[in-house]
Amino acid sequence: MAAQCCCRKAPGAEAAPARPPPEPPPALDVASASSAQLFRLRHLQLGLELRPEARELAGCLVLELCALRPAPRALVLDAHPALRLHSVSFRRASAVSESPCTFAFPAPGSGPPLPGFADAPGAESASCPLAFRLDPFTDYGSSLTVTLPPEVQAHQPFQVILRYTSTDAPAIWWLDPELTYGNAKPFVFTQGHSVCNRSFFPCFDTPAVKCTYSAVVKAPLGVQVLMSATQSVYVEEEGLYHFHMEHPVPAYLVALVAGDLKPADIGPRSRVWAEPCLLPTATSKLSGAVEQWLSAAERLYGPYMWGRYDIVFLPPSFPIVAMENPCLTFIISSILESDEFLVIDVIHEVAHSWFGNAVTNATWEEMWLSEGLATYAQRRITTETYGAAFTCLETAFRLDALHRQMRLLGEDSPVSKLQVKLEPGVNPSHLMNLFTYEKGYCFVYYLSQLCGGPQRFDDFLRAYVEKYKFTSVVAQDLLDSFLSFFPELKEQSVDCRAGLEFERWLNATGPPLAEPDLSQGSSLTRPVEALFQLWTAEPLEQAAASASAIDISKWRTFQTALFLDRLLDGSPLPQEVVMSLSKCYSSLLDSMNAEIRIRWLQIVVRNDYYPDLHRVRRFLESQMSRMYTIPLYEDLCTGALKSFALEVFYQTQGRLHPNLRRTIQQILSQGLGPSAEPSTEPSTDLGGAEADTNPDSPALLLGDEAPSSTISLRDVNVSA
């Protein structure tokens, strides 16, 4: 269904219909070079051809636009040096036609797909070429300025057609068959968050702008194509995939994946897609569960709006854990090893269907509006499904990591604010850190306590989603809606309570001003603290004997991970402690999932415990995932094991994605001192051998304020 411009009139009408009230322009986004505030984007249409052998995507993009002001001289889009623009043209849209663009594909290799139009009688069908230029903007993109013809008038629909090819684009990840599990077919996926999709197609690359989209995709025979769309059809006789997203989404949520993917239904509105060898595991771990989580979310926050909720498992090269692309969550296949991490990650992406996808932060300076609310909703869903104790354990684990990051960055770091102020040139993707999630969660949790508990707050969030669905908001929209929904709180001036002012929550650096009381999870967290205290007690022999009697194999994954994180925080440990830990746990931990193994191996590396380095080597030889390789290489290069890191890298680099390989090379080069030269010679000496039980009213633990400042480029050069 093609979106219509507000100025279209019915055939035969004597006069133009009354113009609707003007829509507010999008929020200003310093991460976008575009002129989004001057135009209304109604719909975008993509014609794409995937060329894996050349690692090239050929595209034709049609933007359906209305100018918001008279006689605009130019249209400015976000683009990228990876885009090669072949032509840009203009076409006046028909006032009566509702037919979207159709795409005719030429013979393979003869050029990008060509647009064709279903013309209405009497409509101007001819397009005219437009002048354009690409200019530098930041290190993550360019600006594309298109000169518009003088006849463009305010509120009159028109189309801009762009033909381009994209190679070596940050948004498009091409994998040779050797980098997949099946080693059979090439694989490609896109990752648009936060500002990468400007290298996928020219766009208004800001979360403030949403539109519907459609796409037609041509791919090599036998390659399955999926997109983040509400409708998809494969026309076998054409060899083309057709997609349509009927709800407005920001550019970063337009996503594509193609490869040797097979489906399996796991519920009435869900299926998993994965490489054939992974499909049985993915199906067994999620069958029935996703519908349970969706139903819980609907009880809390209203109907699921996106039709289907499918999940595609991507190869280990996927640069993040998961991405909430509407209708089609992308998730890294490595997470299948860990049941509990898989559960939490998928539920978090489910929560984004309401918070982030339906209601979106208007700028990247307020990412907490999506991530903080999604984290809160995720924990409400897990509480409904698995109980408060499990939710408190997972929250304790994450808040523990938040405070660890706080110690790393310092309490005055501007990236610890919820409402950040970006200087031009800062890549918003670098600001994805635990403050966005966990400090945002703590503020949302605080709001829920102000109104009397989670049930009343659920009612508010349901109304908030209904009011703002398919739009983008700023923090003030959320807070104004909150105080309007609870007028008694507005009368009490809860937004100005000393030390807990809303403005202070948003703009103060440092830890959260208040944190939830997690005592309902004490039955799960107390054993962790007790075991950690045993291992740090004196005398070691007696402590080790007592500790070894505790069977952690029966623990939840988050308990074991929290225990190992405590040991990591205490590193470097005495060598005799590490030796006893290894004797007690190393074989057991070897049999556990990667989330556990990497933590134990970081303890090994940070304590220079050579007898277990063979486990580090084996782990890095088997892992191709960014989230499991980067932390170990960083630790290896920080300590005394740089030559060991080099040796392992030289032996495994051929199995790594080029982007990951470059990142590790940077770590290795930074980790080498002036006297240390890279060597391919093997290093033979290193590689061998009880509490409040009311879930509705937990107390709040207050924190302190820290000064605030502006985020600049130097502030994001810290590993988050």
UniProtKB/Swiss-Prot annotation:
It comes from the Eukaryota. CDD domains: M1_LTA4H. This is Aminopeptidase RNPEPL1. The lineage of its organism: Eukaryota, Metazoa, Chordata, Craniata, Vertebrata. Substrate binds at residues 321-325. The keyword Zinc applies. It catalyses: Release of N-terminal amino acids, preferentially methionine, from peptides and arylamides. Zn(2+) binds at residues 348, 352, 371. Binds 1 zinc ion per subunit. The active site is at residue 349. GO terms for molecular function: initiator methionyl aminopeptidase activity; metalloaminopeptidase activity; zinc ion binding. It comes from Mus musculus. Its EC number is 3.4.11.-, 3.4.11.18.
